[in-house]
């Protein structure tokens, strides 16, 4: 019921910068085992940054992130560690055993692996977010930048409990399904003005016009 948990983490990235452009791309994957049997999850991430100077006055770019987290694993109930006799045997995979469901021979303490054997589960969370921007550099210290920042989050949850489990046979088993999705965005219009005089005095003003929506 308890493991020597191992965490694996892998990352790779590439980047380059030129006179009029630069980019960065990374990919990461993590596989995490919990100390309890079945208490595990995995995660995939990627990030992309791009920027290009289209001309002396115009710059465009984006910074985007995506992540996917899988929490489909089913952990056992470790409280059974303090309830079972050390002489119990784990017969969860032996349908002919009288102790397959209740290792103690009593129906008061169930095998912590038994319910998981008859359960199928998928639970995944995904996120996509970032910023797409354009910047305009104007004479006399003026500049304007527009940022579009979207965020999309969604998850999928599926669970099936089979009627082959004698504890669920009376109700014919059960199924559960859920989809959730959330999307929001915002647009920032940033106006900036910088002015320097007498070689030591600086004046700077910034104005922001914003719009946003969640759904």
Predicted feature locations:
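Surface-exposed loop/interface segments of Gram-negative outer-membrane beta-barrel transport/assembly proteins
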Residues: 1, 34-41, 45-129, 145-215
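Solvent-exposed beta-hairpin/edge-strand motifs
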Residues: 142
